[in-house]
C-alpha cells in the first residue's frame, strides 16, 4: 500500500462521527422525537414471508446488499481501530446501556470479497451523481443480530455530504412476514450543502426509493 494511502486510511479510521446522537436510529419513536436540527425518516417494505426469505434478505443486507443494489460502490472497507468508537450496546427494551467492547470475530466475506458488516467498521461509499461519484465516508455504529431482526446502522464521518445516522434492518414479524426497515436522521454537513439542500433532499429521496427496492425479490428476478 502506498504511503499516502496508508496515511489517509489511518487518519480516516480514527475519525469520530460528525454528530452527537449516536444510536438514535435504534429508537422506534425517532420520527416523533428527533435530535434538534435533524430531519427524521422511516420507510419500510414487505419482502415476503418465511424463514428462508428472512435469511436470504438478512445475509444480503449484511453484505452491503442495499448499497450495492442501489448502484453505490462500497470502498476502503476497514475494521477501524476502536480508538474513537466501539459501538453502542442496547438493553432488552432498546435502551442504550454502555459502549460495546470490540470482540474478536471470524471474518466473513461476500462473494465479491467485501467483508460483511461488523461493528466499528469504516468504509467510503461512492454515490453516483450524474457523471460523478460523491465520496461519503461512514462508520458502522451498531449491529443488530437477533433471531428475527438483523441489521446495522452507520454514522457519517468528516467529508460526507450529510451529518447523521442511517439504520438498515430486516425483521420477521410474528405472522412470518419479512420486512425491510430504513430509519434515518440527517442534516446537511456544512454551509455548502445547506445552500444546495434542495438538491441534497432530491438525491436522498431517490436513494431512499432505491434502498427500498434493493432487497426485494422482484429486483433479483
Regions found by a protein language model. Give the residues of each.
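Hydrophobic residues positioned within well-ordered beta-strands of beta-sheet architectures
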Residues: 41-43, 123-125, 136, 152, ...
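Hydrophobic ligand-binding cavity/cleft-lining segments
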Residues: 1-124
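Short, intrinsically disordered, mixed-charge
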Residues: 55-66, 145, 159, 175, ...
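Hydrophobic-ligand binding "helix-grip"
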Residues: 126-174
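Extended Gly/Ser/Thr-rich low-complexity repeat segments
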Residues: 61, 167, 197-198
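Compact beta-sheet-dominated globular domain cores
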Residues: 172-176, 181-187
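Short, solvent-exposed aromatic-acidic interface loops
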Residues: 156-160, 183-190
Amino acid at each position: 500500500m502506498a504511503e499516502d494511502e496508508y496515511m489517509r486510511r489511518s487518519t480516516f479510521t480514527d475519525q469520530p462521527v460528525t454528530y452527537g446522537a449516536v444510536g438514535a436510529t435504534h429508537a422506534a419513536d425517532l420520527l416523533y422525537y428527533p435530535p434538534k436540527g435533524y430531519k427524521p425518516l422511516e420507510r419500510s417494505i414487505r419482502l415476503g414471508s418465511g424463514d428462508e426469505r428472512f435469511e436470504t434478505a438478512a445475509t444480503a443486507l449484511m453484505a452491503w446488499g442495499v448499497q450495492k443494489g442501489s448502484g453505490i460502490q462500497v470502498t476502503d472497507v476497514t475494521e477501524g481501530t476502536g480508538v474513537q468508537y466501539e459501538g453502542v450496546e442496547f438493553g432488552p427494551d432498546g435502551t442504550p446501556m454502555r459502549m460495546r467492547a470490540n470482540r474478536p470475530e471470524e471474518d466473513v466475506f461476500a462473494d465479491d470479497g467485501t467483508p460483511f458488516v461488523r461493528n466499528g467498521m469504516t468504509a467510503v461509499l461512492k454515490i453516483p451523481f450524474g457523471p460523478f461519484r460523491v465520496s461519503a465516508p461512514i462508520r458502522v455504529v451498531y449491529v443488530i443480530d437477533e433471531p428475527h431482526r438483523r441489521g446495522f446502522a452507520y454514522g457519517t464521518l468528516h467529508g460526507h455530504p450529510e451529518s447523521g445516522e442511517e439504520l438498515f434492518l430486516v425483521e420477521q414479524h410474528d405472522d412470518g412476514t419479512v420486512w425491510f426497515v430504513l430509519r434515518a436522521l440527517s442534516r446537511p454537513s456544512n454551509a455548502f450543502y445547506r445552500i444546495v439542500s434542495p438538491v441534497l433532499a432530491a438525491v436522498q429521496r431517490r436513494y431512499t426509493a432505491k434502498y427500498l427496492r434493493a432487497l426485494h425479490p422482484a429486483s433479483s428476478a
